[in-house]
């Protein structure tokens, strides 16, 4: 398949696979679910969860979807380019448990 023939979710999974191929210490994901429907977004987040769990990669996820924060170990919220809040999640949720 050519890239244009892949769905948005497939393109995101390929992008994650390319990023993970070199076994990075840090995986920076800028809006990985931004252009996806919620079902496909959950699949992409599950892939990121699996990479984080199995490879021990530090995953930094940037998003405008505040609901995704519930699956993070640590959340840093920005407001007007400044750190507004930092907190840890005592009860993390799995990607399938998130509210969109």
Regions found by a protein language model. Name each.
Residues 1-71, 77:
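ABC family nucleotide-binding domain
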């Amino acid at each position: 398949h050519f890239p244009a023939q892949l769905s948005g979710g497939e393109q995101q999974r390929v992008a994650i696979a390319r990023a993970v191929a070199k076994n990075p210490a840090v995986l920076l994901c800028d809006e990985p679910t931004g252009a996806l429907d919620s079902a496909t977004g959950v699949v992409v987040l599950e892939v990121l969860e699996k990479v984080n769990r199995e490879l021990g990669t530090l995953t930094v996820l940037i998003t405008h979807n505040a609901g995704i924060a519930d699956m993070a170990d640590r959340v840093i919220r920005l407001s007007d380019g400044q750190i507004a809040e930092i907190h840890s999640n005592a009860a993390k949720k799995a990607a399938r448990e998130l509210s969109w």
